[in-house]
From Swiss-Prot:
Any Gene Ontology biological process: iron-sulfur cluster assembly
SUPFAM superfamilies: Actin-like ATPase domain, Heat shock protein 70kD (HSP70), C-terminal subdomain, Heat shock protein 70kD (HSP70), peptide-binding domain
Alphabetically ordered keywords of this record: ATP-binding, Chaperone, Nucleotide-binding
Domain of life according to the entry: Bacteria
Record-given protein name: Chaperone protein HscA homolog
Record organism: Chromobacterium violaceum (strain ATCC 12472 / DSM 30191 / JCM 1249 / CCUG 213 / NBRC 12614 / NCIMB 9131 / NCTC 9757 / MK)
Gene designation per UniProt: hscA
Membership in a protein family: Belongs to the heat shock protein 70 family.
Molecular function per GO: ATP binding; ATP hydrolysis activity; ATP-dependent protein folding chaperone; unfolded protein binding
Length: 619
């Protein structure tokens, strides 16, 4: 996602009136709401003093709804109707949920997004999330004693357009005015930067319940600049829980657990993982539905062993982000740890070993994102800040369109600071072409087949012209929430078509991995493939133009000359079929040479036609 915020935008017409605005961390495991009071950001607790709200919703009998701790207490007894970690389902289909088989839910693969069957009917992740947001809204309004002006809601940096739009829809359903969606690492940077006055280059390592986000941030005299982002939208604390869950099943010899057992053991797995944050070992006890009694000991060494591959996997986006920012680990001034999963000692040790320094943990990793969001919300609501500050965020993946030959033309490159608008002119490929299909793409590769398709739309009503004469301006705009709109406009006639890109499905793990790692692994191969495709497109254009010219003015050539041109055309076709860049370029050059005399004669004829019937004085 991306954000460009300068000083105090949208100042209130009543500058001395404090508007009630909050920051919301809509988390996978827990959610929080925070606000700015007397110049300081603080998390708003519930009536019993608890800051965290478990991101759990239960749909009970007779329409009774429970959110948070009340729902969490019932998750083992009523697993089908108690939805946990719904954030992982936002903007995704069933095929995108890698551990769907081990979850106790009844999924419906509806168009656009997976849905869940509950006692209260079929619920979408948007509806479930809205229930969590509504509970946070009610908590905030009760604590602040008034109606909220709006909220800044945080999302993982690697949430795509579908997931971001789903988050905004959930907020609107909950009755919240969304001031802005804010990347979670960026929110953490705001909290650390403004609270500590830090300067230098920092890494924000955000390992939450369901996602990993890594951001490289440069902080200089109140200016926050995001140099690069990377991450994994399906790697988080839940995956560590799942490894412990599988270990428990294996140790107990359970091969076909019931829904009750799955939920119970998932809960015990999470509790054991959290206990090992402060203890060397912990006991796991449970009574399964068949009466089997479970009593196992889990120590830190075992937890480390069964989750080592996950910890190692978290460092891959770290390396990618550093490479994108062109910064070495030793150039980092500090590492900010965000997210409850970063409490695990072996995660902290792995990060410390990689950077050669202990990470920063002076703010509560569970609260830091909400605190940063609250500071941002306070500014957007028009409340006065003592210090002006500037925040520059970036787009994590390049955006572009498909051009002839199946090539990707990047309009906005990755790591561009946004909000941003970029335009580029394109033209027609065929004579008399009156429509153009616009295929919007996301990714770093050169070929369309290796990028992610976001949307397609068609511009119609282009005036018939010779190939290359029309001018179609394609404009990409990415707003402050990272949502994309694309407009195509034919310059002479003014005909226009546009689309807002809201993909039906989120990125799968494989797609994310392919986009962010294969783009580097296949650089040379992609360059060569692009050269060949470009050569073929040029050759086909030259071939078609030559054949059209022969059809119109072939009488300008004698039999031998025509045979030479036709042989050159055939050579181009043969080279295209052969698929060797050098051969295609050579054949195109030979065809250009063979048609030089023909082109000169056609030009003379056209001049004679234009001058016929005119006097010199008319010219």
């Amino acid at each position: 996602m991306a954000l460009l915020q300068i000083a105090e935008p949208g100042l209130s017409a009543a500058p001395h009136q404090h508007r009630l605005a909050v920051g919301i961390d809509l988390g996978t495991t827990n959610s929080l709401v925070a606000t700015v009071r007397s110049g300081s950001a603080a998390v708003l607790p519930d009536e019993t003093g608890r800051s965290l709200l478990p991101s759990v919703v239960r749909y009970g009998d007779q329409g009774v709804l429970a959110v948070g701790y009340d729902a969490q207490k019932e998750q083992n007894r009523d697993p089908h109707n108690t939805i946990v970690s719904v954030k992982r389902f936002m903007g995704r289909g069933v095929s995108d949920i890698k551990d769907a088989g081990s979850l106790p839910y009844r999924f419906v693969d509806a168009p656009g997004m997976v849905q869940l069957v509950t006692r209260a009917g079929v619920k979408s992740p948007v509806e479930v999330s809205s229930d969590i947001l509504r509970a946070l809204k009610e908590r905030a309004e009760a604590s602040l004693g008034g109606e909220l002006t709006g909220a800044v809601i945080t999302v993982p940096a690697y949430f795509d357009d579908a997931q971001r739009q789903a988050t905004k829809d959930a907020a609107r359903l909950a009755g919240l005015n969304v001031l802005r969606l804010l990347n979670e690492p960026t929110a953490a940077a705001i909290a650390y930067g403004l609270d500590n006055g830090s300067e230098g280059t920092y890494v924000v390592y955000d390992l939450g319940g369901g996602t990993l986000d890594v951001s490289i941030l440069k902080l200089t005299r109140g200016v926050f600049e995001v140099l690069a982002t990377s991450g994994d939208s399906a790697l988080g604390g839940d995956d560590f829980d799942h490894r412990v869950f599988c270990w428990l099943l294996e140790q107990a010899g359970v091969t076909a657990p019931s829904a009750h057992d799955m939920r119970l053991l998932h809960t015990r797995a999470r509790e054991a993982k959290e206990a090992l944050t402060d203890h060397a070992s912990t006991r796991v006890t449970a009574i399964l539905s068949d009466g089997q009694s479970l009593d196992l000991e889990l120590d830190q060494a075992t937890l480390h062993a069964i989750t080592k591959t996950l910890v190692d996997k978290t460092l891959t986006p770290v390396r990618k982000a550093l490479r994108d920012a062109k910064i070495a680990p030793e150039d980092i001034q500090g590492v900010v740890m965000v997210g409850g999963a970063t409490r695990m000692p072996h995660v902290q040790k792995a990060v410390a070993d990689y950077f050669g320094r202990a990470p920063l943990t002076n703010l509560d990793p569970d609260k830091v994102v909400a605190l940063g969001a609250a500071i941002q919300a306070n500014v957007l609501a028009g409340n006065k800040q003592d210090d002006e500050w500037l925040l520059l965020d970036v787009l994590p993946l390049s955006l572009g369109i498909e051009t002839m030959g199946g090539l990707t033309e990047k309009i906005i490159p990755r790591n561009s600071t946004i909000p941003v608008a970029r335009a580029q002119d394109f033209t027609t490929f065929k004579d008399g072409q009156t429509a153009m299909s616009i295929h919007v793409l996301q990714g770093e590769r050169e070929l369309v087949s290796d990028c992610r398709s976001l949307a397609k739309f068609t511009l119609t009503g282009i005036p018939p012209m010779v190939a290359g004469a029309a001018r179609i301006r394609i404009t990409f705009q990415v707003d402050a929430d990272g949502l994309l709109s694309v407009t195509a406009r034919e310059q002479t006639s003014g005909v226009e078509s546009s689309i807002e890109v809201k993909p039906s499905y989120g990125l799968s793990d494989d797609e994310i991995s392919r986009m962010l790692s294969e783009s580097l692994a296949n650089v040379q191969e992609d360059i060569e493939a692009r050269k060949l495709r470009e050569a073929i497109v040029d050759a086909e254009s030259l071939r078609d133009a030559t054949l059209n010219a022969l059809a119109q003015d072939g009488d300008l050539l004698d039999q031998a000359e025509r045979a030479e041109v036709e042989a050159a055309v055939a050579a181009v076709a043969s080279a295209i079929a052969e698929g060797v860049t050098r051969r295609v370029n050579e054949a195109s050059a030979a065809l250009n040479h063979a048609t030089e005399t023909f082109a000169s004669r056609r030009m003379d004829r056209n001049i004679q036609r234009a001058l016929k019937g005119h006097k010199i004085t008319d010219l």
